[in-house]
Amino acid sequence: MKQVILILILLASIRAIAQEHLYDRIFFANSPMENSYYYSEVSYSGNSWLKNMSKRLPVNDSVYFTPGNSLEIDYVSSPNGQWQVKLFYRPVRGQDFFSKATHMFMRLFVSSQTDTKQLPAIAIGSKKDENHHFITLHQHISDYKRGKWLTVKVPLRIFQIKDINDVDVILFRQQSNDGKEHIMLIDQVEFLAEEHAPVRSKPILTSAKGYERHIDITWQPIEDSAVKYIKIYRSSDGKNFHPVGIQSTGIARYTDYTDTVQKKYYYKISLLDKNYHEPAASNVVSASTRTMSDEELLDMVQEAHFRYYWEGAEKNSGLALENVHGRRNMIATGASGFGILALITGAERKFITRESLTARFEKIMSFLEKADKFHGAFPHFLNGTTGKVEPFFGPRDNGADLVETSFLAQGMLAAKQYFNKANKREKYIVDRIDRIWKNIEWDWFRKDDSSKFLYWHWSPDQQWVINHKLIGWNETLITYFLAISSPEHGIPASFYYSGWASQSKEAEKYRSGWGQTKDGSLYTNGNIYYGVPLKVGVSNGGPLFFVHYSFLGLDPRKFTDAYCNYFSNNRNIALINYRYC
């Protein structure tokens, strides 16, 4: 029986990998910050030297292979010295599955009078290891020329690495000792396969919209797996175009910051394959920047946040992904509750039609009805294709997450109120929401009848193994509020003070543990921070999401307990945070 279960688990894992988008392992494409690249480390000794900014590589934003920047390695290799650069892999949450790679590729631009033997040596490996197998760089460059972008292609097997997935650093070090200054730029440092499929799609731009200092352009979504990037070109005269950025295939829009008001710009895009070849360009669209009022600025910000949930949703379910540029099939249930609220706002603000919202909710409810639930509660993460639980945080996280469920329920209850039209479609949505809401067994998460707390997690095979009690001040107020309000599975109202706002020794220890202070450990605080009084909150109030998550549905102006009014308390936490920053 155990063998059968193991086989089923392995098959499920294989299916998950097959369904998920495969990323390339990229060590450098662009630096999001100007001046220096955070994920690098520079060192030198003796008479050798390496240009750096606070021991990091400088960023060059004027010469690049793909827009908008590259990394500059400006060095002097002396006989009595040594220099070294470490380029670290930047892990991205949810980028867990990678395409099979056979080579390390890098684009190289040599701007100095440098011979091939004066180029550095290179190695790959783990940050934990001290010894690495270096090879000479020049042996893997064909048709070496200065002043143009060259392709460096090194078979990964040469580096003598047992498991390529363990590689998290690329190293460059001094190879010669001529004592002269040399300058080279590097870009698109990545692990790829040697052979790639050609791009067969044609890009089609659909819109351009101007704001005060930027322009948003959109295109038809790209489904062609051979496409690596969308490359964006801008022109100020409609004739002479130059590249301004690249975009990943999971996003069908780009924001171009021009920093110029009252000017017209033209745009076109092309699709890059993994060899960076560009087939035909798209059609051209144009828009002008314009002066905006404060009201228009706020509308712009709100619509942009709405688009994250509208355009960035998981395709099958219509719900929120855990993060964009992460797993493309993994839904975060709590974030989906926030997304539902954003969708309602979008319809109310006429960003979309009520008909479009209704259609999206029909998709959402069809998915949620069939998705995994445990005593009516949803897991933290769901597979958007199958509706099955995704134990993203480990094997113990394979069941219900009551807090994430409360965030989702908060959104659904708002939708239940919003869909108030006397038609069959909206009434059916309301009925479906009502069934899911009433079936959440909040009282089950007491663990036993003697408990004065709710518990965060429950696992179908390990039960209460995580054993995390819900104790405020944090983001879990809405969980207690909904549990007390439940029409079918309610808990006593006394749990608000015995659980959420508990002043027991256990609760005091919990708060002082994560807060690393006694301030606020009894739920109440009473101190003044940066001139602002704080009635409730651990330390100086904690992260701002504590005042966000529970009050997206609850109106803090109307929420007062024995200790404070939560609009005033939340405002003071925001002021403390502002003054701290």
What is the meaning of each model-derived region?
Residues L171-K180:
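Short beta-strand-plus-loop segments that form exposed binding edges in beta-rich domains
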Residues E195-A226, V261, K274-M292:
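Pro/Thr/Ser/Gly-rich low-complexity, intrinsically disordered linker/stalk tracts
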Residues E212, Q262, K274-Y276, V285-C581:
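Ser/Thr/Asn(+Pro)-rich, low-complexity disordered segments
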Residues Y75-I161, G179-L185, E190-E195:
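Extracellular ligand-binding interfaces
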Residues Y229-Q262, K274, A280-A281:
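Recognizes extended acidic, P/S/T-rich segments that occur
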Residues Q19-K55:
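Extracellular carbohydrate-recognition regions
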Residues L57-V85:
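Short carbohydrate-recognition loop motifs
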